């Protein structure tokens, strides 16, 4: 076939679809006319329940139509669809395309065309279409029944039109001269595969053979215009590599010079940094907050180039200077989230969320004791206020005690009942004291005695006791809070 088979198949399908679209609505109208005739016959014979049976008998008579009735139906389709000019040619084009496609030979014999075209007419195809569509209607007569809901009736119309389209396609296939096509297909020789001796003008055989027999050869090395390529021999390349000398490092590279070129390990630089940091840390009042921030930023610019180990060592020195007990801190250098220029540092109470003050003498210790007395059995020490009660409570050196109607009010806003206390005088902690002296006030009850050891300025504001001689105090029996934990001593 000179024409592409795929393209020819598309042409055949387009012609066939066009013919089906033209004939489908008018074939459907013809079938409805046959159903209407069946309803009239049922009304005349007073057999309304036999409408579908009468309709099936009329469909069976389609094959017996005379030529005049077939011609009348053909003329009706041409005139109604306004296809009288090309309907005959469209039918011949559909038949011819099917014959050529099925025979796989465009040069079909003239005998088949002449004999078939002389006997083929449009009326014959339309008659065959009615016969095939009548068979589908005979098998499904209820689709034409009018005594149903409008929705069901419309659905039945769509189904009938689909059956008509399939019936027209079958009619075209059955009207083809299939016997003559098979003979032409079987008798005539067909070249399904191309002849190897036949040359293609686009790809000559000589060029194809040369490409197969001759291996692919790379072209000569590309050369730039006016700059010929120089091929270096391996021996010359090795000799040229020997000219390079190893790089001599005169001074070992390390972390001595970093950042902005400041030698952080120089003694004068270290002394300068330490002096500035200590001035900022130890100063009580440097100035306003912007001045403090500016001073810190100047220090930060100097030590940005320092190594982590050097910063850690330097931070340890500054931390030990500020904190004699060397407590753990979140930021040793103190650039962020730390309070500068304060000799008193606040530590959060682990239980009551309060704060204790650390004096300037480095006595950052919190004296406290957790005492419990069950059934007048109490644990006491030199700094414990012992009271008779039924519940266990914790006392600290920051608690302000009062006695109102034999009830004690503590700093955690809880009232404890003291049934045997005879005195209401207690000592109050002086939080603003910076002295290193201690004051002891003794309050006696019937069964117990209480004694507080609090940092004070030497005066007892609320208590009845006087000054205490520090030499008489047993400091070994006092429990201290270390590493944020409470240790208890029981006598």
UniProtKB/Swiss-Prot annotation:
Domain of life assignment: Viruses
Q: Which stretches does UniProt call biased (Polar residues)?
A: 355-364, 390-404, 429-444
In its keyword annotation, does this UniProt entry include Calcium?
no
Q: Which UniProt keywords apply?
A: Virion
InterPro entries linked: DUF5764
Compartments annotated for it: namely:
Virion
Locate the region Disordered.
Answer: 355-444
Query: Does the keyword Aminoacyl-tRNA synthetase belong to this entry?
Result: no
**What's an example GO cellular component term for this entry?**
virion component
Its name, as the record gives it, is Uncharacterized protein L417
> What are the leading ranks of the lineage?
Viruses, Varidnaviria, Bamfordvirae, Nucleocytoviricota, Megaviricetes
